Amino acid sequence: MISKSDIEEVLSRYNTDKVSICTICSHTALQIFHGARVEGFKTIGICTEDREQLYKSFPQAKPDKIITVEKYSEILDPKFQDILKKNNVVIIPHGSFIEYVGPENISEEFTVPMFGNRQSLAWESDRERQRKWIESAGLIMPCKYKDPSEIDGKVFVKFPGAKGGKGFFTVNSENDFYDELNRRVKSGVIEETDVTKIGIQEFLLGVRYYPHYFYSLFEDSGMAAGKGNVQILGIDRRIEPIDEAYRGLPDVPPEFFDYTVTGNQPVVLRESLLPEVLSFGVNVVDASIKLFPPGIIGAFCLETIYHPSRGFVVFEISARIVAGTNVYAGGSQYSQFTYKEPMSMGRRIAREIKIGLKEQTLSEIIC
């Protein structure tokens, strides 16, 4: 695994007056580029040719420089990494970055400095380790089924990685499980390799909330955790085709029973629930410091369901910026309680890097 000292050695050769913010052109890239631009950084987008025009279409969010690739896995080529290093690049990982490049490759082959702790991406991508992390934080999780033969009621079936709900399904029995699984494999919705890492959880009733957190080592606003503070910058819920199935439509066609995320909506919680939600973020940070020091750094999100009779249940963690933050590119209801200026998650990441450069503490938030 690439060590912290390996990255520090690369950073030592950087011209810190010319650091660029870089990511793959997908997911939250527009928000990341916009936030970096506002904070005074040059930006570099790694883009496939078919997406170039999109990222050139937004004057305030287009990258200053685009590097075109045929496929995103090319960034693992040592020569390509050298190009990024010569541009004094700090990579901002997001869901598409992890999915296209792969968490193992990020840990073993990608030696370009990244914002945050790359160990947290490995913990996010492994269902067992993720569960250990969440439970170590003292949070309630859905009941887990180790084998399809244990299914005794409605369950939710998930696959590993940042897939945005693609291929997920619900079933009520072992037979239904295999029918749905085989159908998805045959249609190419999921890969054969995904089947061995399948996750089966109890199906939960309630309202979905996805709070967006930022763990800062450099700012003192928020709730204390570890050596820094946890801020809450927004909350969203995801829009999925399955949502349309519950609008009173008669004879709902099967294609509506799909959990692929297609968009996001802004959400505001009842203020009485905020202390508990903020404490979740603190507990997750404290647990991460013990499990994989120095722990998670920067942006993360908890995927939760709330029901008045049961409270919050946390069913997943995303250990980096999430697509739901795109609804707050101009700041959120919560970020304006902390900052006088509009503060998106993309800008907040750039702000942390900016402080690290100014205080000569960049290595504390880069790995």
Give names to the regions the model predicted:
Residues 1-10:
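Positively charged, low-complexity intrinsically disordered leader regions
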Residues 29-34, 53-54:
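Short N-terminal binding/cap micro-motifs at the start of the first secondary-structure element
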Residues 41-50:
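Short internal beta-strands
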Residues 49-156, 162-163, 173:
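Conserved N-proximal alpha/beta basic substrate-recognition cap immediately N-terminal to
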Residues 73-74, 120-233, 271-282:
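Active-site nucleotide/adenylate-binding loops and adjacent lid/helix of ATP-dependent enzymes
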Residues 154-158, 212-213, 304, 310-321:
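A short beta-strand motif that forms the metal-chelation/ATP-contact edge
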Residues 201, 292-309:
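A short glycine-rich, hydrophobically flanked beta-strand micro-motif that places a catalytic Asp/Glu
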Residues 213-288, 318-350:
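ATP-dependent carboxylate/phosphate-activation module, predominantly the ATP-grasp catalytic core
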